[in-house]
Swiss-Prot record:
The gene is PTPN11. Its EC number is 3.1.3.48. This PTPase activity may directly link growth factor receptors and other signaling proteins through protein-tyrosine phosphorylation. The SH2 regions may interact with other cellular components to modulate its own phosphatase activity against interacting substrates. May play a positive role during the stages of erythroid cell proliferation. It is an enzyme of class 3 (hydrolase). This is Tyrosine-protein phosphatase non-receptor type 11. It comes from Gallus gallus (Chicken). The keyword Membrane does not apply. Pfam families: SH2, Y_phosphatase.
Length: 593
């Protein structure tokens, strides 16, 4: 269980239904405190456009669903039913599936809020990336609904004067929508609390001053709240250097991680392959390059093309989900690589090609024409391509091509080329809507072909626009699968793609455009969901559960005691003994500045 952000501490059943219907998809779920039985909980699950509510009892000894399996923690119960599909059923036998956690909204859009992060993970982050005075705020895993301020207190060499841990954790209590650190002033928001203690540092009982000098920012974001993150990233810096603000800072941090991705590119550097590279230093990584298998055995380099396979690597809880969409990122064809391009398309069974450049831009060749004229047929080495039809849309041209191998009869495959024509020669499009409509069409076409191989994406070098299109598409696929309330991480996604082809997403403008495109997609999706929900009925009342387990012995049905222990996430058990600073005993000290 990597997160328990599915726990919503302050919502009613009606609010849960509204959240699941407007933000979730079928299979989305959340847990919340029971309003009818204080101390108990309720599991709310979206199924076929409606919401089912399931009661969870806490006897003081264990958690269960009024019968069936028993668990030590709420997190273990949820994890069990997520991983064991078919175990949770209604009386009529219908299966209730927990697929996608619907995350609780972040309490702040500030980038120092990291959401779900364990104490150890916070210490690792602050130790590796922070310095003296670096801080972050995270959710408390041992006390759902509360938060923790983690501060690096050691010097920049990683050691504090008295040998204590170089990271201090301070519990932030949240009650009645007010925040405090266990005594003293209460604040209306986490931001107000942090700003106060930045100006008025806390002092530990042993005298260590907790100075909040610089935030350690996160790049993770709840997709539904991307507008707030974009607003934060768009703020000008507080210094006189007005250029170095959020987007620049995030992109520059990403650029500094390039040294971690220096994989070998020996095949592209071979003398025999140099004329197959459009740009002599933009070469494919060896470990992900597309290797052509049907070349001339007398020509040892006939297996080379400047192209890499891109495999998205994001979690999925759905054990029976279909394989994820993959991509081939490649350069624009040269005159001497067109034959190899079609060999690759045929070998990989690619059915969709995305071209994001014009043939010539600013007087320079970006990609030679690798397809025949409309209604024409042309042979490219051992491959034969027939252009059946071309149709023009607002921003792109769609070409229906028939691909076959010479000498293999009339067996043809349909390949669809989507040629995006309106990317400006300089910068990025001013409106992401055209790109999103284009990618939506590409997505539907790829989904409609059951055995389709990777989507081939190219521009000129095969890294800038190509990387931008692929990253946007990957992020949108995550949102499609998990709903608008899932977590996304733009820099992490780019880093993942860059680990498979170097230099993907080239400029800060392209980086910013990715955020703008995802924001536009979310806003459009939310409007559509809201319109759909206006005509739908509300969710069901509580359902009776039937278990498919062989052991269906009922648990103790005694009334719940008025006070029940706070559930603890299983991965935090070893951390439960960690001593939080008793900030009620801390003294406030005026700023040293």
């Amino acid at each position: 269980m990597t997160s328990r952000r599915w726990f919503h501490p302050n919502i009613t059943g009606v609010e849960a239904e509204n959240l699941l219907l407007t933000r979730g998809v079928d299979g989305s779920f959340l847990a919340r405190p029971s309003k009818s039985n204080p101390g108990d909980f309720t599991l709310s699950v979206r199924r076929t456009g409606a919401v089912t509510h399931i009661k969870i009892q806490n006897t003081g000894d264990y958690y269960d669903l009024y019968g069936g399996e028993k668990f030590a923690t709420l997190a273990e119960l949820v994890q069990y039913y997520m991983e064991h599909h078919g175990q949770l059923k209604e009386k009529n036998g219908d299966v209730i599936e927990l697929k996608y956690p619907l995350n609780c909204a972040d309490p702040t859009s500030e980038r120092w809020f990291h959401g779900h992060l364990s104490g150890r993970e916070a210490e690792k982050l602050l130790t590796e990336k922070g310095k003296h005075g670096s801080f972050l705020v995270r959710e408390s895993q041992s006390h759902p609904g509360d938060f923790v301020l983690s501060v690096r207190t050691g010097d920049d060499k990683g050691e504090s004067n008295d040998g204590k841990s170089k990271v201090t954790h301070v519990m932030i209590h949240c009650q009645d929508l007010k925040y405090d650190v266990g005594g003293g002033e209460k604040f209306d928001s986490l931001t107000d609390l942090v700003e106060h203690y930045k100006k008025n540092p806390m002092v530990e009982t042993l005298g260590t001053v907790l100075q909040l000098k610089q935030p350690l920012n996160t790049t993770r974001i709840n997709a539904a709240e991307i507008e707030s993150r974009v607003r934060e990233l768009s703020k000008l810096a507080e210094t006189t250097d007005k250029v170095k603000q959020g987007f620049w800072e995030e992109f520059e941090t990403l650029q500094q991680q390039e040294c971690k991705l220096l994989y070998s590119r020996k095949e592209g550097q071979r003398q025999e392959n140099k004329n197959k590279n459009r740009y002599k230093n933009i070469l494919p990584f060896d470990h992900t390059r597309v290797v052509l298998h049907d070349g001339d055995p007398n020509e040892p380099v006939s297996d080379y093309i400047n192209a890499n396979i891109i495999m998205p690597e994001f979690e999925t809880k759905c054990n029976n989900s279909k394989p994820k969409k993959s991509y081939i990122a490649t350069q624009g064809c040269l005159q001497n690589t067109v034959n190899d391009f079609w060999r690759m398309v045929f070998q990989e069974n690619s059915r969709v090609i995305v071209m994001t450049t014009k043939e010539v831009e600013r007087g320079k060749s970006k990609c030679v024409k690798y397809w025949p004229d409309e209604y024409s047929l042309k042979e490219y080495g051992v491959m034969r391509v027939r252009n059946v039809k071309e149709s023009a849309a607002h921003d792109y041209t769609l070409r229906e091509l028939k691909l076959s191998k010479v000498g293999q009869g009339n067996t043809e495959r349909t390949v669809w080329q989507y040629h995006f024509r309106t990317w400006p020669d300089h910068g990025v499009p001013s409106d992401p809507g055209g790109v999103l409509d284009f990618l939506e069409e590409v997505h539907h076409k790829q989904e409609s072909i059951s055995d389709a191989g990777p989507v081939v994406v190219h521009c000129s070098a095969g890294i800038g626009r190509t990387g931008t299109f692929i990253v946007i598409d990957i992020l949108i696929d995550i949102i499609r699968e998990k709903g608008v309330d899932c977590d996304i991480d733009v820099p992490k996604t780019i880093q993942m793609v860059r680990s498979q082809r170097s230099g993907m997403v080239q400029t800060e403008a392209q980086y910013r455009f990715i955020y703008m495109a995802v924001q536009h997609y979310i806003e459009t999706l939310q409007r559509r969901i809201e319109e759909e929900q206006k005509s739908k009925r509300k969710g069901h009342e509580y359902t009776n559960i039937k278990y498919s387990l062989s052991d269906q012995t009922s648990g103790d049905q005694s009334p719940l005691p008025p006070c029940t222990p706070t559930p603890t996430c299983p991965e935090m058990r070893e951390d439960s003994a960690r001593v939080y600073e008793n900030v009620g005993l801390m003294q406030q000290q005026k700023s040293f500045r």
